[in-house]
């Protein structure tokens, strides 16, 4: 698969990327599965409800068992009553995680990268470095490359790049092992350094 190789002025040449990573068919069902699993695994329980033992209530029987013509009632904490406990309350300890096999996850990442390459949303650079940790420098460099919303995948995130890009709203910088499916899809472009492509090939190939 041929990708654009950009220089510092944004001029493009051609880079031959490995087909093992960028030449796969798009598997929509698999990509959907790993994205949903990624979101589920990032979710934490934040809902809490009370069951009938936890709500504040009296243990007095509302009325006698027989003779009133009304339905039997033992306590006002019953789930049948307004203000009573829930029969099956939500708990912060709920586990939302979904298991995805490593082989499936890697295949899904390859599928996403291949589709992004076909849509011309992947570009390559030799390296991505900055002289100092200034957001202005990072913004100017990305502007010269013609990039605004971009995920930068580099073999090693140095301190200058991290500090300079963390305040840019539509820019993220990660190492290959942290390139998750949601981020790959979210950003308009993916910029990858040559050493990072070698690492991706080693991880996913």
Curated annotation (Swiss-Prot):
Residues 58-69 have a biased composition (Basic residues). InterPro entries: Ribosomal_uL4 (IPR002136), Ribosomal_uL4-like (IPR013005), Ribosomal_uL4_dom_sf (IPR023574). One of its GO terms (molecular function) is structural constituent of ribosome. It comes from the Bacteria. One of the primary rRNA binding proteins, this protein initially binds near the 5'-end of the 23S rRNA. It is important during the early stages of 50S assembly. It makes multiple contacts with different domains of the 23S rRNA in the assembled 50S subunit and ribosome. PANTHER family: 50S RIBOSOMAL PROTEIN L4 (PTHR10746), LARGE RIBOSOMAL SUBUNIT PROTEIN UL4M (PTHR10746:SF6). Part of the 50S ribosomal subunit. This is Large ribosomal subunit protein uL4. It comes from Bordetella parapertussis (strain 12822 / ATCC BAA-587 / NCTC 13253). The gene is rplD.
């Amino acid at each position: 698969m041929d990708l654009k190789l950009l220089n510092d002025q944004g001029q493009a040449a051609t880079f031959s990327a490995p087909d093992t990573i960028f030449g796969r068919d798009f598997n929509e069902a698999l990509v959907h599965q790993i994205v949903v699993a990624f979101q589920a695994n990032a979710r934490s329980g934040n809902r809490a409800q009370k069951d009938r033992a936890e709500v504040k209530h009296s243990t007095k029987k509302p009325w006698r068992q027989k003779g009133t013509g009304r339905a039997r009632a033992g306590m006002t904490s019953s789930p049948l009553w307004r203000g009573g406990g829930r029969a099956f309350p939500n708990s912060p300890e709920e586990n939302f995680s979904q298991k995805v096999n490593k082989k499936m996850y890697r295949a899904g990442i390859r599928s996403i990268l291949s589709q992004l390459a076909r849509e011309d949303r992947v570009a390559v650079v030799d390296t991505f470095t900055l002289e100092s940790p200034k957001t202005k420098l990072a913004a100017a460099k990305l502007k010269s490359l013609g990039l605004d919303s971009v995920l930068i995948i580099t073999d090693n995130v140095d301190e200058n790049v991290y500090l300079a890009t963390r305040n840019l709203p539509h820019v993220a910088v990660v190492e290959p092992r942290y390139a998750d499916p949601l981020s790959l899809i979210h950003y308009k472009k993916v910029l990858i350094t040559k050493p990072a492509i070698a690492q991706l090939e080693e991880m996913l190939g």
